[in-house]
Amino acid sequence: MNDNLETVQLLPLTSDIVFKQVFGQEESKPILRVFLNDVLGLDIQSSEQITLLNPIIDPKYLDDKMCILDVRVQLSDRSLIDIEIQVLNRHNMEKRALYYTCQLCTEQLHTGDDYSKTAPVYGLNLLCFDLYKDSRYYRSFVLKDEETNETYRQTFKISFFELRKAVSELSQTKEVETFELSGLTARDQWALFINSGQQEVYEKLIEENKTFEEAYERLKKASSDETLMAMYRNREKAIRDWNDSITSARKDGVQQGEQRVNMLYERLLQENRGSEIPKAIADPAFRTKLFNEYGI
């Protein structure tokens, strides 16, 4: 690896805008092919089988902390894949994942279309927080018969990839050079690449697999792009503002001594209406309206 690679301050791949730039562009398709095969267990033979449906990053949406910067893919067999990376735990992840994966199904058909045109769908959710209590960092959910355990013929899969769990032991240690990649699965290695942020880890992975070198080069290029850096900072500011509003909302509930206030904010988060929280904080009349709406 070239010595000058270490002189670049790399942006975090756990940022949705950085992830999309590295994995979700036309020139990223060879990397994306290997990533999808390794993580989802697919068998995509060529990057030509991949069509990116939303490669453009529109700067006007980046100050909206609720907007989704996902990577949406269609394969040559018409299968649809939605990849989303989530930094914040808004306590609605399972419902959110279900909604957007179902949306992949409903958006395929138009009035008069035959149901046979419905293609397999995959929702891949990369999480920077722990969603489940056990130690497994990757799990997939499919539709099955309750009695026979027979899998539904039409592929509908929702996967959760809990990055922090996957690298909790390796990425936090300062003795990174002591671990052996030979004991790790391909999925383990991707978790390290995305979440560790350590130069030693990148070097180990690059020695093991050329795909990681290509992904590293894209990350380095993205980190040197002034326009993308500005977009990243705007995005991070929007997320910080979101965090501040949630913290303020919870303090507001405590200070007022009203359990119902905190209940309201939690309900809004669960139903993907978190953007209404700042108004609920500032406007008592609007807050009362929401109390009535939810029966709190």
Model-derived features: where do they sit?
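Elongated, amphipathic alpha-helical interaction scaffolds
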Residues: 1-296
